[in-house]
Swiss-Prot record:
Catalysed reactions, as listed in the record: heme b + 2 H(+) = protoporphyrin IX + Fe(2+)
Species per Swiss-Prot/TrEMBL record: Pasteurella multocida (strain Pm70)
Protein name: Ferrochelatase
Family named by the database record: Belongs to the ferrochelatase family.
Gene: hemH
UniProt keyword Cytoplasm, yes or no: yes
Protein's job: Catalyzes the ferrous insertion into protoporphyrin IX.
Keywords linked to the UniProt accession: Cytoplasm, Heme biosynthesis, Iron, Lyase, Metal-binding, Porphyrin biosynthesis
Chain sites annotated for binding Fe cation: H195, E276
Signal peptide stretch: none
Compartments in which it is found: Cytoplasm
Gene3D superfamilies: 3.40.50.1400
Alphabetical list of InterPro entries matching this protein: Ferrochelatase, Ferrochelatase_AS, Ferrochelatase_C, Ferrochelatase_N
Enzyme class: lyase
Amino acid sequence: MNKAKTGVLLVNLGTPESPTPKAISRYLWQFLTDPRVVDLPRYKWFPLLKGIILPLRAKRVAKNYASIWTEQGSPLLTITREQQHALQTYFKQQEKNIVVEVAMTYGEPSIKSAMQRLSTQQVDNLIVFPLYPQYSSSTTGAVFDAFAQVLKTQRGVLPFDFIHSYHTNEDYIAALVTTIQEHFQPDEFLLFSFHGIPVRYENMGDYYREHCKQTVLAVIDRLGLTENQWGLSFQSRFGKEEWLQPYTDQFLAQAPSQNIQKMAVICPGFAADCLETLEEIEEENKEIFLANGGISYRYIPALNARPEHIQMMANLILNKLNQTSK
């Protein structure tokens, strides 16, 4: 057993506490007031958000959340806790002195509360693990900001490491290939859909699109697909600003007219299934594709708590720990 105890912060985006307009409004306020997510001038954005956007959006989003909510609660939080428990079990079996806690950038359990739990367990160092394979300032960058905000309140800052990205990690690519092979049929078109970001963020230096491309090319190389068998698109845009294109919903609407009748969609940027995959991709976008002449449509689930995914996560943590100890 290692003498030093390592604390791991497993961080995902976040989720409302319940599928109600009030809870969702509270969650969206925290999310959409983060300048990493929306960087409009505060004096313009806050009144618009509070007075118009949240009252309208919270009611609509509440219906969407209600459609995916389970007895255990939010799928995102439930799956992330499954990942936590699987990792903790693995580290115990391997006799590694590692404690894993779940944290969310927005909502609960917060990064602050997770760090407090690790503090009570007297960890000696930290590894912050944002569950975003492809770096973006609006996701991974936001995790770093939230983590740094907690550090500002501490006099005794523990040594820490930060997993920046893992978009071409061999274990990650292999896990994607395995799950695709389990679901994908040779006569289908394979669409890789990633959460979008404003083009303006890319112009300011965010290299998210390039990370997405590198992930897809690595997977395609392993699968041996030709150019006419796959595509790359970006989903979940909001507002009037231009986002990364092609847009997933528009791609799916136009695909049948391009002789693409059978569609399989995977979202490699999501480490756990959530609203954007279970409702937007699996339900809304399926309707778009079929309504425009598509014959069949399948959503390939996120890696979630698959054994290959857990092993990949464990390897990333152990590799980071080994690098630090050298």
